[in-house]
UniProtKB/Swiss-Prot annotation:
Pathway: Amino-acid biosynthesis; L-lysine biosynthesis via DAP pathway; LL-2,6-diaminopimelate from (S)-tetrahydrodipicolinate (succinylase route): step 3/3. Zn(2+) 2 binds at residues 107, 142, 368. The lineage of its organism: Bacteria, Pseudomonadati, Pseudomonadota, Alphaproteobacteria, Hyphomicrobiales. Pfam families: M20_dimer, Peptidase_M20. Homodimer. This is Succinyl-diaminopimelate desuccinylase. Keywords: Amino-acid biosynthesis, Cobalt, Diaminopimelate biosynthesis, Hydrolase, Lysine biosynthesis, Metal-binding, Zinc. GO terms for molecular function: acetylornithine deacetylase activity; cobalt ion binding; succinyl-diaminopimelate desuccinylase activity; zinc ion binding. The gene is dapE. One of its GO terms (biological process) is diaminopimelate biosynthetic process. Signal peptide: none annotated. The keyword Metal-binding applies.
Length: 395
């Protein structure tokens, strides 16, 4: 049986599986069919949690004597939206002018397809690998991320698995293949502020207490001054207000409650705990120093709730992993990639607790968009980078 050496063929097989979270959609079955002929053992545990859908995952390993490299990623995708808006059907893997179209083409079935092809090519050329390679693939990255990578890592550890390094195949490049390797991620912390007032007629504000006055005051205290100016490896921490709501459609009524939600992406100046303390201190001062109605003695009354499980900031410093991948990228693309910590969170935030981890994949410009697509030349380029990395990593 021929091995899965062609990344475009691999990707087409994966795209044709409509694996919108939480559906497996046949994607893990297609991946298993690529891995087993190469001698991988494959297991597909299903994880459960209260009030969340069951999620099927895949863990595959090909064992050898030497270091253990994990490739991590996901085969689930976001919904395509209105399929009529697509140039080609989102699960058709249509090719036009050297470009493959389909949901998940870059995020991140393309990365999976390329790493499979890279391993297959290495085995065809060398017969074996001087170490162990595993695939840790979830179907829950685009969803709640509760029954996916975080549980799959623990499941594997309980079975005696350990890893020396990991690559996550997320689309790390902003504009062109070889732009950037992600060597860390900012932390993420979310919360909701609720201010309680007294409902009343807009024409008689002295009889009411407007919570909008309070919520804007508290929000303003979180926006200014800036939390920091950035660090050597990370950009400045940034808080965004994601919603403000009073649940009031009447224009002549002062609402009795207002809420504001926020998210902050933070750098290594902070831990989640120290940042929470800073936010609480700012809110306490703003609430103490201001009133819902001029002349009132009572400070602003508010509640603060945190979203569970904040993501912690991390930075990978493993010289072998970063250096080998950087050299591989340069050898194929001719340029030295930036070592970046920008962007949002990924499942690397879970893997960092088990082994050094970096992210490198395709160009992310069309991820989650209508007409998500990837150039076939980029698929070949990424496969060559991965193949060179595998050869050099295992020596």
């Amino acid at each position: 049986m021929s091995l899965a050496v062609n990344p475009a063929d691999n990707l087409a097989a994966l795209i044709r599986c409509a694996s919108v979270t939480p559906a497996e959609g046949g994607a893990l079955t297609a991946l298993e069919a690529m891995l087993k002929p190469m001698g991988f053992s494959v297991e597909r545990p299903v994880f459960h949690d209260e009030d969340t859908p069951d999620i099927e995952n895949l863990y595959a390993r090909k064992s050898g004597n030497g270091p253990h490299l994990m490739f991590a990623g996901h085969t689930d995708v976001v919904p395509p939206g209105n399929e009529g808006d697509w140039k080609h059907p989102p699960f058709s893997a249509a090719i036009e002018d050297g470009v493959m179209y389909g949901r998940g083409a870059v995020d991140m079935k393309g990365g999976v397809a390329c790493f499979v092809a890279a391993v297959a090519r290495h085995i065809e050329k060398h017969g074996s690998i001087k170490g162990s390679v595993s695939f840790l693939i979830t179907g829950d990255e685009e969803g709640p991320a509760i029954n996916g990578t975080v549980k799959l890592l623990d499941w594997a550890k309980q079975r005696g698995e350990s890893w020396d390094a990991s690559i996550v195949g997320e689309p790390s490049n902003p504009n062109a293949l070889g732009d950037a390797i992600k060597i860390g991620r900012r932390g993420s912390l979310s919360g909701t502020i609720t201010v309680h007032g007294v409902q009343g007629h807009a024409a008689y504000p002295h009889l009411a207490e407007n919570p909008v006055r309070g919520i804007t005051t508290l929000v303003d205290s979180l926006l200014y001054p800036a939390f920091d100016q950035g660090t050597a490896n990370f950009q400045a921490s940034n808080l965004e207000v994601t919603s403000i709501d009073v649940g009031n459609k009447a224009t002549n009524v002062i609402a009795n409650k207002a809420t504001a939600s926020f998210n902050i992406r933070f750098n290594d100046t902070w831990t989640a705990e120290t940042l929470q303390a800073e936010i609480i201190a700012r809110l306490e001062k703003a609430a103490r120093d201001n009133r819902l109605r001029p002349g009132r003695e009572t400070p602003i009354k508010y509640e603060l709730t945190w979203r569970e499980h904040p993501s912690h900031v991390f930075l990978t410093r493993d010289e072998k992993l970063i250096g080998t991948l950087t050299d591989s990228v340069e050898a194929v693309t001719g340029k030295r990639p930036e070592l970046s910590t920008s962007g949002g969170t990924s499942d690397a935030r879970f893997i960092k607790d088990y082994c050094p981890v970096v992210e490198f994949g395709l160009v992310g410009q069309t991820m989650h968009m209508v007409d998500e697509r990837v150039a076939l030349a980029d698929l070949e380029g990424l496969t060559q980078i991965y193949e060179r990395f595998i050869a050099d990593f295992f020596g």
